[in-house]
Amino acid sequence: MPPAKKRARSYDSVKTRAAVLAQFRHVREAVAALTPEQLDGPTRLGEWTVRDLVGHLAWMVDSVPRLLAAPAPAARELALLDWPSRTAAAAERIDEHTRGIEAADPAGLYARVAEDYEKAVAGAADERLLQLSFGAMTLGDFLVTRTVELVVHTDDLNAATGAGIPYDRQALAACTRLLADTLAMTAPGGAVEVRIPPYAVVQCVEGPRHTRGTPPNVVETDPLTWLRLATGRTEWAAELDAAHVSASGERADLSGLLPLMG
């Protein structure tokens, strides 16, 4: 019998809504200080410039009011843990759209997006369905995915500019937990315990299940290293060599399971 599909943990809606706005504000403040030369500079995301990345970040938040303004679909098609794997199929469309975003005035763009987001979510129910390009999901779940987009791309922006943009604690927590739960769903089991303090602990990989005492197979890392591994920004071997990941036990090698999303 195949293993039961993992049920997503619950997220505090009020905190998630606030976290999206808080992280976007952090990015907005940093973007306002970027010079034209910095905006035209490269990123680690292929051919994207910093300006492309800035536009993409705005779009990730702007998608909330835009989807809420569209008619609601008839039925839910996506659970929260389905989302990470579905993004890969939309990569080409996302790239094309990002390159077409008008970001000549980043400050004006971000001011408009922040205002539209706050107005749109103010009276919207978590159960409201949104029609994404690859399926329908609830607003509550979609907002959790926005924390992933914002935190991961904040890290990209920091890497490209050295801006030192801070991470909202709640946004970083939600991002970490969703990607950790995605790993547990992708490789169900109890042989390996993955610890990402202070936000998440999950068990994964088939094999003997740990019940008490110290687990025989343990992986531990920090949240930013985890999101870089989970999204392919870095590689398992490199982070092990840099001592950003500790892995003990014969099954504690996650290299074959990563990345979880691109």
Predicted features and spans:
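C-terminal interaction segments
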Residues: 2-6, 70, 88, 212-262
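An N-terminal domain-cap segment
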Residues: 2-51
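Internal, conserved structured core segments that host functional sites
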Residues: 94-146
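Short, helix-capping/interhelical loops that line the mouth of catalytic, cofactor-
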Residues: 2-15, 62-115
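Glycine/small-residue-rich hydrophobic helix-like segments
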Residues: 188-225
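A glycine-rich beta-turn/hairpin centered on an aromatic-Pro dipeptide
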Residues: 170-198
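Hydrophobic packing residues in well-ordered alpha-helices of helical domains and bundles
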Residues: 17-20, 50, 107-110, 114, ...
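Short, contiguous alpha-helical
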Residues: 40-80, 129-178
